[in-house]
Design a protein with these regions (language model features):
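Structured beta-strand-rich core segments of catalytic domains in phosphoester-bond hydrolases
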Residues: 1-80, 178-179
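Soluble or luminal CAZymes and related metallo-dependent hydrolases
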Residues: 27, 61-65, 96-104, 157, ...
Length: 199
């Protein structure tokens, strides 16, 4: 799967090689989108969610859709899973607001499919005090996994892990930071798996 943030969604193709566009946000500036591999996944059902707003959201609206979640059937595992693209409020907001958004996002994923394996990838904008965030997401039944290298290098003060993954019921094997492209954030590659039905 491919999770995007800050994309120009109006220009995204419906097909990207072996990938199909499950859905994208259409009414805001955050440009979330999710592609899935057709040969492995099918029957995508997507939904966008608004999360608690900060001052940045009020001044630079529209930023209402901060979560795009897609439920798909994983043909290899023989079960449904949830994948999500997420974008938290920027550093002008407090960590407490981002924790609130992350918690609300996890609750939204549960509402889509309680008990289903879920993985949420994106720009968490949480480079400092991630140890506290690990404990916070654990209360929701989620694990937090950082990548092997920092994902944002633009500002000396705020360099760090901005982009990472939270998951529930998914074994995350590794998260790698890839070489920088045109974005100011470095992309990450998440490798993981869910158990097959019957295992």
């Amino acid at each position: 799967m491919l999770c995007l943030q800050e994309a120009h969604t109006e220009f995204l193709p419906a097909e990207l090689g072996p990938l199909s566009l499950a859905d994208s946000t259409k009414t805001n500036r955050l440009g979330l989108a999710l592609y899935y591999r057709r040969e492995r996944f099918e029957n995508p059902e997507s939904k966008t969610f608004a999360l608690k707003k900060g001052m940045h959201d009020i001044l630079f609206s529209p930023t209402n859709e901060r979560l795009l979640a897609t439920k798909l059937f994983d043909k290899e595992a023989g079960r449904e899973i949830i994948a999500a693209s997420f974008h938290a409020s920027p550093l002008t907001a407090r960590n407490s607001l981002r924790r609130n958004q992350i918690k609300a996002a996890h609750e939204a994923l549960t509402a889509i499919g309680e008990g289903l394996p879920a993985v949420m990838v994106g720009d968490y904008n949480y480079p400092l005090f991630t140890g506290r965030l690990v404990k916070h997401v654990a209360k929701s039944g989620y694990d937090l996994t950082l990548s092997d290298r920092r994902t944002y290098l633009r500002y000396k003060i705020f360099r760090g892990h901005f982009d990472f993954v939270t998951s529930s019921g998914v074994t995350i094997e590794k998260v790698e930071t890839l070489p920088q492209g045109v974005s100011d954030h470095l992309p990450i590659l998440v490798t993981g798996h869910v158990e097959r039905v019957g295992e």
